[in-house]
From Swiss-Prot:
Segments forming domain Rhodanese: 790-889
Gene field: TBCK
Superkingdom, taxonomy of origin: Eukaryota
Species per Swiss-Prot/TrEMBL record: Gallus gallus (Chicken)
Stretches assigned to the Rab-GAP TBC domain: 466-651
Name of the protein this chain belongs to: TBC domain-containing protein kinase-like protein
Length: 893
């Protein structure tokens, strides 16, 4: 979007036509409200950016099908010129006409027609240049079908529009749409407007509306419409004095037959504008982030750089995009409906005044005044930025231009000031509503994202603090490593040819996050369908499973106007977190995943694990929808956004920690209930505190050895050329264990049945060496740095017999022989070694032995005794022997 600069923002409102409540669609579901349909169609208007068009910013839905639209606005319009009654020069007429044609031509290029062109909708900025307002009303209302008022003004409607009349569908279940107006209809409207500017007065003012329409239709019988209009309004002398170019222009616009009337594109290239067009360089839309063309191709700098900073009183806020300014305006307390209420555009009527005077037995009522609220109020209210500017008055100019190359090592988190670093410690919900904080984060992320992928490392660093909601979609794409010409790839996929999956997709979409207005709109459904189908078609080795629609929802919501980016994000997300989950036979992948999850529950919360296993409430009964959809099936979108902000920074094992964190929030209720109550509890999941869930899942992740979540069916290591260079920017929090180079000390794959038989997870010998710091602290890869005063995080329990232990053991380990460790009841036999074990309760305990069965059984006994963080050394002591790290106790003399 363009910067706000000298323009302002305005709000206008209208009502969508109400639908009957007792009618269902052809699919048996209630009809989608017209306001929802309009809201969905509106979104594409936000992407149409041109100097001659007022930028659309937002639309909100109120009560009783009310819609409020926010858009770029200018105080002056051609209406003001007409009100002054001054004649406009021929050269100025040609300039105005050319600028209007520029806007119309760009709209037509995007498949849109204005249809409501009038002097009040042709705005003038402070430099006198044209900006077309309300150009999207005809498009968003489905050519006027979804509203009870006509689109357009009687005096400016083209003859073919009047001849068609106002068509309203009689049956709401049928798609009876009128024939849409074409680009040539706008040229007639432009011709009437230019005629009015030439003569300095409005036409048809003495005629009733019906007479006006009738008069326009009768113009088909005359040869020279311009002369007839001049004679009717007594201004023939003025018309005769106009330049030949202007008269020719008026005649071309006011051609009665649409077939003989030019399009805006054709008229723009007419010889009439041969001189005018030279003063207007062609408009090139800036290349997007994921573009196949160089983003800096059209970058130009002034010859004298000092010209950029000559004005000391720069309005830095006005240099930000309209979208950003509007977002900050809302954070600073801005409310569209409230602004309209203050200007008395929205008026509430006491309910008693709406009662009828007389009601018959059959329900027919009489005596009610006509409700005029459904008609169009064309007023646009200017939104005041005073409150926002007041909030930002203490923000210095340097905040709008952060330096990205400076060494900011003195700041704990961010490139922001010390106050912002302090604000970064506030709860996320407060940070996201803080105007100053969000301004700084948006400006910083905007600059970093414009330098993507060069600034990929810094994007990762800043995302660990938080992600500004306004830029979440594009930031997620950067975190997922999306690059290249994504639009061309998406366009190349066949999304039209019917496939067997179509039926299932059609069934699933109307049930996916339909509480959200955007995703429940017909436009949202169509985009869902295309993105899902593109993914299915482009992954022939995978299949569509129910839940894929939920997985798609966050990406589609954040990139509603960029299906290609939503598809690219989804295609990057699934291999990382859900590798092979969508195979036709995915049972081995799912079973391994759930088994590792069970081990994680036992590792972090043995008491809860014991209880769930005793009542038979296994993860297969509740966790498949969690992981298959990465929690999008169980949480609303606003919670998913905060959850995934952290998930995308973690590796593929992080979802296990999220799952355990959810269970721990429900811990008391789960421990107090049996199988049936737990099933009921998870059928309607209680409210989960997502911020707490994220905080606890990070803590759980830090306590989990990297190799404990190893899965043989996880994504294999990528080639260097496939990783997009992201690996270098990731911390150990983000890199998968599978990505690390394989060695003799790495974990080995085991059969699924053997994995299921073990309650506690295995860890690799290299993890054990790192955690014990046997190779020195410089090689530690764990997320938590060990301080000098802290106790060891880990205890090694060697369960071999004492003779084997004395021949060689891991430094710092204790010996608890398996054969004599437990009583018949399963309790630990008390001895100095078990006392040490009890003192380490709460830290990581690694069981080491010769026989796998014994180590697994010993670990299971400890879990039964509610020892947390118990794991098994993969490969036993034999894995450590070749390293030369075993020690022999000094002989007792």
């Amino acid at each position: 979007m363009f910067p706000l600069r000298d323009t302002e923002m305005g709000a206008s409102t209208f009502f969508a036509s109400a639908l009957p409540h007792d009618v269902c669609g052809s699919n048996g579901l209630p009809l989608t409200p017209n306001s929802i349909k309009i809201l969905g169609r509106f979104q594409i208007l936000k992407t149409i950016t041109h100097p001659r068009l007022c930028q659309y910013v937002d639309i909100t839905r109120g009560k009783h099908e009310r819609l409020v639209v926010a858009a770029e606005h200018c105080e002056n319009s051609l209406e003001d010129l007409l009100r002054e009654g001054k004649l406009v020069s021929s050269s100025r007429i040609l300039c105005i006409a050319y600028e209007v044609l520029q806007g119309l031509q760009y709209m037509n290029k995007h498949g849109m027609v204005h249809r409501a062109l009038s002097p009040r909708n042709i705005l003038l900025d402070r430099k006198g240049h044209v900006k077309l307002a309300k150009f999207g009303l005809y498009h968003m209302t489905a050519q006027g079908v979804d509203v009870d008022f006509p689109i357009g003004y009687p005096s400016y409607l083209a003859p073919e529009v009047i001849a068609q009349g106002m068509v309203k569908p009689s049956d709401h279940t049928q798609c009876e749409k009128p024939l849409p107006s074409g680009p040539k209809s706008d040229l007639w409207s432009l011709g009437i407007i230019l005629f009015e500017l030439c003569v300095g007065r409005k036409l048809f003012q003495t005629l009733e509306i019906a007479e006006r329409l009738k008069f326009v239709i009768t113009l088909g019988y005359v040869d020279d419409i311009v002369t007839v209009l001049a004679e009717e309004h007594g201004c023939l002398d003025i018309i005769k004095d106009l330049s030949e170019n202007v008269i020719t222009l008026l005649k071309k616009c006011l051609t009665f037959q649409p077939s003989k009337r030019p399009t805006p594109e054709e008229l723009m290239h007419d010889h009439l504008f041969s001189e005018v067009s030279l003063t207007y360089p062609p408009f090139h839309k800036p290349a997007g982030l994921f573009s196949s063309s160089p983003r800096c191709a059209d970058l130009t700098l002034p010859e004298d750089i000092s010209q950029l900073c000559k004005d000391e009183d720069n309005d830095y806020l006005a240099e930000r995009s309209i979208e950003e300014v509007y977002y900050l305006w809302c954070l600073a307390g801005g409310d569209l409906e409230k602004e309209l209420v203050n200007k008395e555009i929205i008026r509430s009527k006491p309910p008693v005044c709406t009662l009828p005077n007389f009601v018959l037995e059959d329900g027919e009522s009489f005596g009610q005044g006509r409700d005029r609220s459904s008609l169009l109020d064309d007023t646009t209210v200017t939104l005041s930025l005073c409150q926002l500017r007041n909030r930002l008055k203490d923000v210095g100019g340097e905040a709008f231009y952060p330096l990205l190359e400076d060494d900011q090592s003195t700041l704990p988190h961010s490139n922001s000031s010390s106050e912002l670093s302090a604000a970064a410690n506030l709860p996320l919900i407060i940070r996201e509503r803080d105007t100053e904080y969000q301004l700084n984060r948006i400006v910083l992320f905007d600059r970093l994202l414009k330098a993507y992928p060069y600034k990929k490392n810094q994007i990762w660093k800043e995302a660990r603090v938080d992600i500004p909601p306004l830029l979440r979609g594009i930031t997620w794409a950067a975190l997922l490593g999306v690059e290249g010409a994504i639009q061309a790839k998406y366009d190349a996929i066949d999304k039209d040819t019917p496939i067997p999956t179509d039926r299932q997709i059609e069934v699933d979409i109307p049930r996916c996050h339909q509480y959200d207005e955007l995703l429940s709109s017909p436009e949202g459904h169509a985009k869902f369908r295309r993105v899902l189908k593109a993914w299915v078609v482009s992954h022939p080795d995978l299949v569509y499973w129910q839940g894929l629609d939920s997985l798609c929802a966050p990406f589609l919501y954040l990139n509603f106007n960029n299906e290609a980016l939503a598809y690219a994000c989804m295609s990057a997300f699934i291999p990382k977190y859900l590798y092979n989950f969508f195979l036709k036979d995915n049972s081995h992948v799912i079973q391994e995943y759930l088994t590792v999850f069970s081990q994680m529950i036992a590792f972090h919360d043995p008491e809860l694990s014991n209880h769930l296993n005793e009542i038979g409430f296994i993860p297969d009964l509740y966790a498949i929808p969690w992981f298959l959809t990465m929690f999008t099936h169980v949480f609303p979108l606003h919670k998913i956004f905060h959850l995934w902000d952290t998930l995308l920074l973690g590796n593929s094992s992080f979802p296990f920690c999220i799952g355990v964190a959810i269970l721990q929030q429900l811990r008391d209720r789960l421990l107090a209930n049996g199988f049936n109550e737990c099933i009921l509890l998870f059928s309607d999941l209680p409210e989960i505190d997502i911020e707490r869930c994220v905080r606890e899942s990070i803590n759980l992740f830090r306590w989990t050895p990297k190799s404990a979540t190893y899965r043989q069916y996880a994504q294999p290591p990528r080639q260097a050329n496939e990783s997009n260079g992201t690996r270098s920017s990731m911390s150990c929090f983000s890199v998968d264990y599978q990505e690390a180079p394989r060695g003799d000390l790495s974990r080995d794959s085991i059969k699924l049945d053997d994995l299921k038989a073990e309650v506690s997870p295995r860890i690799s010998a290299e993890d054990l060496i790192d955690l014990c710091e046997l190779t020195g602290p410089s090689h530690s890869k764990t997320p938590i740095k060990k301080t000098k005063s802290s106790k060891p995080k880990l205890l090694v329990v060697d369960i071999r017999n004492s003779e084997d232990f004395n021949r060689g053991h891991i430094s710092g380990s204790i010996n608890v022989p398996f054969a004599s460790a437990f009583t018949a009841e399963g309790d630990l036999i008390q001895c100095p070694a078990t006392a040490t074990l009890q003192s380490f309760k709460g830290r990581v305990v690694v069981i080491v032995g010769n026989a796998v069965k014994n180590t697994a059984a010993f670990a299971a006994h400890l879990v039964k005794s509610k020892y947390p963080r118990v794991c098994i050394l993969d490969g036993g002591i034999n894995k450590i022997k070749p390293t030369g790290l075993l020690t022999v106790p000094s002989p007792q003399i």
